[in-house]
Amino acid sequence: MAFSLKGHVAVVTGNSAGLGKAIGVALGQAGAKVPVNFAHNEARGRWALEEYQQAGIETCLVQSDVTTEEGVDALFTAAEKQLGPVDILVPNATCDQPHRPIEEYDWAFYQSMLDFFIKSPFLLARRGLPAMRRKKWGRIINITSEVFHRSVAPFSAYVAAKGGQIGWSRSMSQELAPFGITVNMIAPGWIPVERHEKDPQAEKDAYLSLIPMGRWGVPKDIADAAVYLASEEAGFVTGQTICVNGGMTPW
């Protein structure tokens, strides 16, 4: 079954590279209009813009820091002006995620995690909800992580922030359901993308050995789940988490 997103506008944060780009392109190829956004790397943003355009996606380029209210407003204002009202939202932007013993973290790092995974989704949803409420239709798809479900260590800052994001998403799913707005989560496993190129091979081999399906996940695996959750066919699905990790969390 091919899911159609024609007539929709999807904001996917951090969609100039990695999982975000795969999700953005997949939503666009399903028919949605998708702005490309970047925080600092304009060259990468422009390269991604060309890739979206070559895929036949109606798009535009926006620079914005989605951990700030001003940045979120700039992204939505540009998207609304150039593409139309936003009714699909995928908070995906992330920061570095180093494994460290808790004694080696400081609060500033914990705060950066909370900014990306709780503050940013909150600001994005608050800005986007008026249009969704007017339409009585909307999709919010939070990109969480298997780390919360697996209690991965030493990774406390990331696990804590993702746990908060999951709780927020579940609560929002109940609050927004009467308005035809669904809130769901995709929890990827370790999906190697550009920023993992220098990760130690021994760590990669150890993780791969734990995956029941015996292969690495690829960005398309995550993107396909996002297209489904954004579709009409997922209209009666809300408050749910799809773990896309080859069977690492069988519950």
Mark where each language-model region is.
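Short, small/polar-rich loop/turn modules that mediate ligand/substrate recognition or access, typified
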Residues: 177, 182, 237-239, 245
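Catalytic Tyr-X3-Lys loop
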Residues: 103-122, 137, 141, 158, ...
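Active-site helix of classical SDR
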Residues: 125, 161, 169
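Conserved glycine-rich Rossmann-like NAD(P)H-binding loop of the short-chain dehydrogenase/reductase
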Residues: 32-47
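Substrate-binding pocket helix/loop in short-chain dehydrogenase/reductase
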Residues: 72, 94, 100-114, 196, ...
